């Protein structure tokens, strides 16, 4: 609870917590089991940017300590902070590779059917959608 800054709510029922507070308690629960592998679906949902950053640092520390973190993230800028990315659509893997690889960025554009500008800024990868739609037709089979 201290790692996710949720200690002050330890006596409150989960139903009385906000979405972000509840998410931080659930993340603390995931850490408490001390598993070598964490599988998470949208762990950063409902968290404000400072707590998203804190959790990204926590996940990085787990990996550096020899653990494995697998996470589903739909926010591309957050997903780009990982070492590797698997881009999926319609239940199929379209691409797997390093987050900083141009072919990964191309796969993201394909799956979102939208031009995405990926830039490295202040030590982080950022993804910004273009205001113009991708000119190609979507090539993903349902």
Show where each model-derived region lies.
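Conserved ABC ATPase "signature" region
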Residues: 1-9, 34
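Conserved ABC ATPase signature
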Residues: 13-17, 21
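Hydrophobic anchor residue at the start of the ABC signature
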Residues: 27-28
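Catalytic Walker B motif of ABC-type/P-loop ATPase nucleotide-binding domains
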Residues: 38-42
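H-loop/switch region of ABC-family ATPase nucleotide-binding domains
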Residues: 72-74
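H-loop (His-switch) and adjacent beta-strand-loop-beta switch element
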Residues: 85-99
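ABC ATPase nucleotide-binding domains
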Residues: 109-142
């Amino acid at each position: 609870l201290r790692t996710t800054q949720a200690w002050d709510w330890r006596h409150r029922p989960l139903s009385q917590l906000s979405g972000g507070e509840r998410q931080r308690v659930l993340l603390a629960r995931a850490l408490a089991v001390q598993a070598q592998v964490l599988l998470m679906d949208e762990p950063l949902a409902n968290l404000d940017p400072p707590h998203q950053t804190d959790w990204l640092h926590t996940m990085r520390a787990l990996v550096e300590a020899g653990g494995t973190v697998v996470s589903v993230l739909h926010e591309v800028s957050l997903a780009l902070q990982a070492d590797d990315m698997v881009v999926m659509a319609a239940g199929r893997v379209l691409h797997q590779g390093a987050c900083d690889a141009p072919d990964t960025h191309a796969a993201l554009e394909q799956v979102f059917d939208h031009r995405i500008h990926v830039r490295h800024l202040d030590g982080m990868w950022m993804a910004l959608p273009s205001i113009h739609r991708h000119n190609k037709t979507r090539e993903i089979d349902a």
